[in-house]
């Protein structure tokens, strides 16, 4: 079983990686976009980490929904709605659970990807 604490660690490590690599992400975005991806993602995940004390107290579904809403409100461009949708849909698929099986996590990720497809009309 995957504990909620493991999912919190996953988001924390992801936020650290975004922060560490924000310049590289921005440089990559400059080649095809408006050179703001790293900055926007760092801003969003910095806010997620600031909200982590209250997020960590919630069940897994509410935790993922909180991450998603934060990203929707703080990350600009196309990334905010895409990442926000991923986490919102994962939260909706999670219900009020405190731990997940690998199969349940896979189903949540699939629900998140389906949400991105719907948002992007892919």
Predicted regions and their residues:
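N-terminal loops that bind phosphate or other acidic moieties
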Residues: 1-122
